[in-house]
Amino acid sequence: MKNIFFTLALLVSFSTFGQKIESLKKKTSGNTKERTLILDILRASLYQDYKQEFIFIVNTLNVSSQYAWFQGTAVRKDRREVRTNDYDDCCHVEGLLKRNYGKWYIVELEAFSTDVWYDGIWDDYNVPRALFN
């Protein structure tokens, strides 16, 4: 009985603590390719919705083996004022991405939201909560 309990405890600890999370907030020579790829995917999605080209001030970009969490501020590439709807809360952007067969895909992305839409998202997608810190 003790062996079964020990084995279960060990499996739970591996699944909980086995995820390595890396911050890509700052661009370095080692993370430039992946960081740029993730940000380009977010830019393309925002362009479809807002027809404006954006660059990001990255506040958080945490990456695990399967997921990436982004929080940042969108700024127009031409440095003009961002055009949004009257009810939008400019200019913050948050997004969850998933890596599938080596490619990143957007799972959830919200720009200029007026609420904390991502509360509990870690439970919805079974993502380590540490990714969001």
Briefly describe each language-model feature range.
Residues 49-101:
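Mature extracytoplasmic domains of secretory-pathway proteins
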Residues 120-133:
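Extended, polar beta-sheet/loop recognition surfaces of beta-rich domains
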Residues 1-4:
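Positively charged n-region of N-terminal signal peptides that target proteins for export
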Residues 92-121:
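Short beta-strand edge/turn micro-motifs at domain boundaries
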Residues 25-53:
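Short, non-transmembrane alpha-helical segments in secretory-pathway proteins
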